[in-house]
Curated annotation (Swiss-Prot):
The keyword Transferase does not apply. The gene is chbG. It is an enzyme of class 3 (hydrolase). Involved in the degradation of chitin. ChbG is essential for growth on the acetylated chitooligosaccharides chitobiose and chitotriose but is dispensable for growth on cellobiose and chitosan dimer, the deacetylated form of chitobiose. Deacetylation of chitobiose-6-P and chitotriose-6-P is necessary for both the activation of the chb promoter by the regulatory protein ChbR and the hydrolysis of phosphorylated beta-glucosides by the phospho-beta-glucosidase ChbF. One of its GO terms (molecular function) is chitin disaccharide deacetylase activity. Mg(2+) binds at H61, H125. One of its GO terms (cellular component) is cytoplasm. This is Chitooligosaccharide deacetylase. The keyword Hydrolase applies. Belongs to the YdjC deacetylase family. ChbG subfamily. It catalyses: N,N'-diacetylchitobiose + H2O = N-acetyl-beta-D-glucosaminyl-(1->4)-D-glucosamine + acetate; diacetylchitobiose-6'-phosphate + H2O = N'-monoacetylchitobiose-6'-phosphate + acetate.
Length: 252
């Protein structure tokens, strides 16, 4: 059975170092897709690079935890900025869901304005779209527009509640992250997916060159390690040997 493998690099637009790392991993590695933060400091640079790479799938990385929102969000921001206090608000069930739905629509329009096309799919920074309160908003938004959505099926409480016309991969992995970033780790993810009989799989990654913006991230130098592994010739060969076809969310 042919299986579609989407290797999606998150954080396109975060910084020039991030952008260049993603492009390197696409041109000379196994990355096939990326998702962009429309409020990132280097989003215009990302859009410029993407115009030179029309086959690179570019989706939208919905942001509710970093930088300035596109719309006014007094119920979520502090001093005009987004931040990780969203987790506490989710636990307390005090999220401003109307503001979040409006911000999603505004970020989507910003993406179209910057990239000149609709995104191939949606996911989110720090997986906030998988919060139980936010997921229905994003899932309905994606289904109405006919675009795919990253779904961590281990997190969805009731898969039966998903819109019937919502597109996603059968499998998703965020395990290529952290301290163990190796070719062996990547291949274990593929083998586990194949064992489950999944016809499509998304593997999340964050390849980057380190610059001043990336240095401020809690996840910094491992991004360089990811880049090294993802551009390995042996990894590309091992993926092909396992019968995976590289693809984007337009292929599912």
């Amino acid at each position: 059975m042919e299986r579609v493998l989407i290797v999606n690099a998150d954080d396109f637009g975060l910084s020039k170092g991030q952008n260049y790392g993603i492009v390197e991993a696409y041109r000379n590695g196994v990355v096939t897709s990326t998702t962009a933060l429309v409020n990132g400091e280097a989003i215009d640079h990302a859009a410029q690079l993407s115009r030179e790479l029309p086959a690179l799938g570019v989706g939208m990385h919905f942001v509710l935890t970093l930088g300035k929102p596109v719309s006014e969000m007094p119920g979520l921001t502090r001093d005009g900025l987004l931040g990780k206090w969203i987790w506490q608000m989710a636990e307390e069930d005090t999220l401003p869901l109307d503001e979040i739905a409006h911000e999603l629509a505004c970020q989507y329009q910003r993406f179209i304005d910057v990239f000149g096309r609709e995104p191939t799919h949606l996911d989110s920074h720090h997986h906030v779209h998988m919060f139980p309160q936010i997921f229905p908003i994003v899932a309905l938004f994606a289904a109405q527009r006919g675009i795919a959505l990253r779904i961590d099926r281990q997190t969805v409480l009731n898969a039966d509640d998903l819109p019937s016309d919502l597109r996603s991969t059968q499998g998703f992995s965020s395990e290529f992250y952290g301290e163990e970033i190796t070719e062996a780790c990547f291949l274990r993810i593929l083998d586990a997916s194949a064992h489950r009989g999944e016809a499509s799989l998304e593997v999340m990654c964050h390849p980057a060159f380190v610059d001043n913006i990336i240095r401020q991230s809690a996840y910094c130098y491992p991004r360089l390690t990811e880049l090294e592994v993802l551009t390995s010739a042996s990894l590309k060969a091992a993926i092909a040997e396992r019968g995976y076809r590289p693809g984007s969310f337009l292929d599912i």
